[in-house]
Amino acid sequence: MAVVSLSEMMEAGAHFGHQTRRWNPKMSKYIYCARNGVHIIDLVKTALCMNNAYKWTRNAAKSGKRFLFVGTKKQASDVVAQEAVRCGAAYVNQRWLGGMLTNWSTMKARIERLKDLERMESSGAIAMRPKKEAAVLRRELERLQKYLGGLKGMRRLPDVVVLVDQRRESNAVLEARKLDISLVSMLDTNCDPDLCEVPIPCNDDAVRSVQLILGRLADAINEGRKGSNDQRKV
């Protein structure tokens, strides 16, 4: 049985690619045709890729792999946070800061700073500071929550990065590849499938398409972790 049906993908607009002049020729094997100057993605191929991605992700979760969801564009931001939280993954949904992976020791220190500030705020310690100092600390807290809030539970580097919009998140791709971190990537017709281990050809601009794909991947992670827990109980 297919993880996602053709009708679900059609309704989500997953088949709409970019304008033909913006395509990457490496995506040709996933393109069905061109219509009115826009490439149409072959959803039969997408369904097959999604089946593979589901199994791969489920098995990775079952073996204890750690996941990071990345998608900072406006139409993906809320979905990335929602689905990452649902499956217990870390996430980046506002802005990719250089060195988030390759300079992990520094990033980890900033995350600890965020946790310290949150403890200070909840305990009332910030409120007890002079007004100007409290304002500075709260601005720092707000900034760290915005950019690093989704990483608070990530104690080590992830094993897998789940990506929305390969081109926009090119720095995340470069850092992951430099560290041999696996990439599960939604690929629109302007992307390069050679830059990821697990390709999912689909529209990465439509909210419903992003919701559909990330939702299924989150399901796979939850299913894999349940299987891992069941094995430990035996």
From Swiss-Prot:
A GO biological process held by the record: translation
GO molecular function annotations of the record: structural constituent of ribosome
PROSITE patterns found in the cross-reference section: RIBOSOMAL_S2_1
Cellular compartments per GO CC: cytosolic small ribosomal subunit
Any Pfam family the entry gives: Ribosomal_S2
SUPFAM superfamilies: Ribosomal protein S2 (SSF52313)
Alphabetical UniProt keywords: Ribonucleoprotein, Ribosomal protein
Keyword Metal-binding in annotation: no
Residues in the signal sequence: none
Superkingdom, taxonomy of origin: Bacteria
Protein family: Belongs to the universal ribosomal protein uS2 family.
Name of this protein: Small ribosomal subunit protein uS2
Organism name: Prochlorococcus marinus (strain MIT 9515)
Gene coding for it: rpsB
